[in-house]
Amino acid sequence: MSFELPALPYAKDALAPHISAETIEYHYGKHHQTYVTNLNNLIKGTAFEGKSLEEIIRSSEGGVFNNAAQVWNHTFYWNCLAPNAGGEPTGKVAEAIAASFGSFADFKAQFTDAAIKNFGSGWTWLVKNSDGKLAIVSTSNAGTPLTTDATPLLTVDVWEHAYYIDYRNARPGYLEHFWALVNWEFVAKNLAA
């Protein structure tokens, strides 16, 4: 079984003006596609062939892990975003954020700060720990919460390819616009899982 690039849940220009169609074309169409292609080439004829993406991530290392995790991380990231989204969460997500961080404003400030300070390439995540509390976790390179007992709820990609076309080296500007795209319905589904 080979993996395919999952379809975006919206048109390539749907996240503008926050994330341009050009960024999506390169980020999704080139970077994400390359991880899929590399993974398929790396697993061909190995014990990983025929396994799910999650199984590969949890049992591999090196190039296989890096490409599998990047395929999963990117697919998750695209679903964390939506046109006409953003704002503040409601319902159980709002309650969980308030219980863990005090307020949405405090959470947003802490998440943004963690993402800005995530050195180099990586991801910043909102996760639900096994005790039910929410936490902000930053991972480097292809790191993913799937290798832990935490449940990923939300992520932001802080690899430069995620924002360089639109924001150059200004990661804070990218993070400011990220909040206008957060798909809280997707976060709520992850929290309920």
UniProtKB/Swiss-Prot annotation:
| Molecular function via GO | iron ion binding; oxidoreductase activity; superoxide dismutase activity
What cofactors does this protein use?
Fe cation
Q: What reaction is this protein's catalytic activity?
A: 2 superoxide + 2 H(+) = H2O2 + O2
Q: Which Pfam families match?
A: Sod_Fe_C, Sod_Fe_N
InterPro entries assigned:
Mn/Fe_SOD, Mn/Fe_SOD_BS, Mn/Fe_SOD_C, Mn/Fe_SOD_N, Mn/Fe_SOD_N_sf, SOD_C_sf
Modified positions (N6-acetyllysine) are K51
Key words, A-Z: Acetylation, Iron, Metal-binding, Oxidoreductase
Q: Does the keyword Iron apply?
A: yes
Gene Ontology, cellular component aspect: cytoplasm; cytosol; membrane
| Sequence positions that bind Fe cation | H27, H74, D157, H161
The Gene Ontology biological process annotation of the record reads: removal of superoxide radicals; response to superoxide; superoxide metabolic process
- Keyword check for Zinc-finger, yes or no: no
Q: What note does UniProt attach to the cofactor annotation?
A: Binds 1 Fe cation per subunit.
What EC number is given for this enzyme? 1.15.1.1
Q: What induces it?
A: The transcript is subject to small RNA (sRNA)-mediated degradation; sRNA RyhB-binding at the ribosome-binding site (RBS) both blocks translation and induces mRNA cleavage by the RNA degradosome over 350 bases downstream. RhyB blocks translation even in the absence of the RNA degradosome. Deletion of fur derepresses rhyB expression, and leads to less expression of this gene.
Query: SUPFAM superfamilies, alphabetically?
Result: Fe,Mn superoxide dismutase (SOD), C-terminal domain, Fe,Mn superoxide dismutase (SOD), N-terminal domain
Q: Which family is this sequence assigned to? A: Belongs to the iron/manganese superoxide dismutase family.
What this chain does, per the entry, is described as: Destroys superoxide anion radicals which are normally produced within the cells and which are toxic to biological systems.
Under PANTHER family, the record lists: SUPEROXIDE DISMUTASE, SUPEROXIDE DISMUTASE [FE] 2, CHLOROPLASTIC
Subunit info? Homodimer.
Q: What is this protein called?
A: Superoxide dismutase [Fe]
Name of encoding gene: sodB
